[in-house]
Amino acid sequence: MNKKINQKKYLEALNFAFKLHSKQFRKGTKIPYFFHLSAVSNHVIENGGHTDEAIAGLLHDAVEDQGGEKTLKLIKKKFGSKVAKIVEDCTDTKVIPKPPWFDRKKQYISDLKKKPQSSLLVSICDKTHNASCIINDYYRVGKKIWSRFSANKKQVFWYYESLGKCYYTNLKGHKVLKQNFKKLVTEMSRIIHY
């Protein structure tokens, strides 16, 4: 059962996220980045998320992509400490420039195991959308999709497979969400080894 969403607070976050990411696009595409944020937030709501989780879904990339610690402080001021904590938990770095890809991802997975359920929910919704986009883009553009990443395709697969194990072990409930993520990882394995 879905919890009631505070629409006024959500709309404020929607506008804030849109402004923050208005000049950003998905890697290798002309798709405005905001659509990813919206998809993640919608997925959170569809999986029973409450207002703070849904807002964190909209803002989950704001810190690492749009200003680091300064942006996190602004999120806390505008939307509260619960939202800021989830966003921080879903951020793989607050450091600009970003550390190397593998180091960030390895640390993210290690830290994710200790995170609260709200953060795990937003994270799996984010990574589900990312994995789905990778697979869809693979079928659209082929193997050149891997050039979009700071890692090779086997490292990308390692990351998603490791995330799946983390979600299965640490995210309570959400059986269908975890099964869907597992299916995406299986499909990713197939296209990587193709």
Regions found by a protein language model. Name each.
Residues M1-Y194:
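Active-site helical microenvironments for divalent-metal-assisted chemistry
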